[in-house]
Amino acid sequence: MKTRAVRLYGESDLRLEEFDMGELKDDEILMELITDSVCMSTYKESIQGAKHQRVNDDISEHPIIVGHECAGIIREVGAKWKDKYQVGTKYTMQPAINIKGSMAAIGYSYEYCGGAATFIKVPPIVMEKDCLLPFDENSAFFEASLAEPMSCIIGAFHSMYHLSLIHISEPTRQAEI
């Protein structure tokens, strides 16, 4: 299976390439990507290359596909996942897989899985950690691509629980931190 993708080879070394990903394995899923949002952390990753904490050390020999805020359609399902995932279904991914002892993440660590591609092979760890997430058939792909950054915003608001509001009627009162 061929794909066209933006791959990272090193510091400030991004290349748009068409390449073969090989045959789909029984524990993988093939997705056609429709959208990928651009994130500042992808920019940071492209500048730092292998110095980035989530990027593999050997990207000059095994480049990774950048991008992690993506959504697409399942086009082929490996035998292991046929009971859980169906061809033609719309999905997005949670990029931070949270593997104990590892910083691996979609768009930073995988040779055939990242958002800036036409097709990707989703590695088994994504399904094992329930990080391949379906979304409503009536929702736009861009909405699913924005799920991860939106969760960051919501998380930031929730983390502000320790702050109280400054009351307009009491102009001398300071916010409690």
List each model region and its residues:
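Extreme N-terminal starter segment of soluble prokaryotic enzymes
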Residues: 2-4
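Single conserved hydrophobic/aromatic residue that forms the stacking wall/gate
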Residues: 166-177
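Glycine-rich beta-strand-centered segment in the early N-terminal region that forms part
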Residues: 22-36, 51-100, 114, 136
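Short cysteine clusters
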Residues: 39
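Extracellular beta-rich ligand/substrate-recognition surface
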Residues: 7-13
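Short Gly/aromatic-enriched secondary-structure transition segments
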Residues: 44-52
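NAD(P)H dinucleotide-binding glycine-rich loop of Rossmann-like/cofactor-binding domains
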Residues: 97-165
